[in-house]
Amino acid sequence: MTRVVISVGGSVLVPSLDAHRLKEWAEALINLTNAGIQIFAVVGGGGEARRYIEACRDIGLDEASSDEIGIQVTRINAALLIGALKEYAYPVVAESYREAKTAAVSGKIVVMGGVTPGQTTDAVAAVLAEEVGASMMINMTAIDGIYTADPKKDAKAKRHDILSPQGLIDLIMKEKMCAGSNMVIDLVAAKITERSGIPLVVIDGRDPALIEKALLKGEFAGTIVGNSAIRFPIV
């Protein structure tokens, strides 16, 4: 069975606590499962996690402790997604890579949040893709791909259709030098992707149906990092 790890940004899964939005995501993941793809979803904390982390800093907590609380928020979001998936999901949020691999034996959708302080859920997804031998990692975020520059700030920015792992790392390093920059994926995740050789695909997560269109219908719009030989649909 084809295995796919999906990093679902909290900002696209739960921009607000909206049951309809969660059901849309659940429907998309269930349709992928029914098509014969085993899904692993790593859920981010979104704006809620950032608010908690900021509150932690305001009361004087150290960064590691603040991260731990942020991780708890990602796991709450993961639990919400499990609830929406119902019997299609493994019923417990995986809190480690070992737990995720054990849960995968069930054949159900495995959902997890953060794991380690200082590590983003994108990095968690990249490591998980290695651990479970995924054929690809998909980053579902609030933009439709990786651009030459921030499209919100540069009208001339163009979306990359295909990008090498080193090209992604170079782009992230360039952006990190600019105050307030906001890359689609972080440097650690990009380096893990380069190491593993597992292709990274970036798709606009604001519409959950787009992942179905790409994987099941071949209607792909986004950026492929790594193996340019990937062809959609994958089943």
UniProtKB/Swiss-Prot annotation:
It comes from the Archaea. Pfam families: AA_kinase. UMP binds at residues 45, 67, 115-121. One of its GO terms (cellular component) is cytoplasm. Its EC number is 2.7.4.22. Keywords: ATP-binding, Cytoplasm, Kinase, Nucleotide-binding, Pyrimidine biosynthesis, Transferase. One of its GO terms (molecular function) is UMP kinase activity. Gene3D superfamilies: Acetylglutamate kinase-like. ATP binds at residues 10-11, 46, 50, 141, 147, 150. Pathway: Pyrimidine metabolism; CTP biosynthesis via de novo pathway; UDP from UMP (UMPK route): step 1/1. The keyword ATP-binding applies. The keyword Transferase applies. Inhibited by UTP. It is found in: Cytoplasm. NCBIfam families: pyrH_arch (TIGR02076). Belongs to the UMP kinase family. Catalyzes the reversible phosphorylation of UMP to UDP. Homohexamer. This is Uridylate kinase. The gene is pyrH.
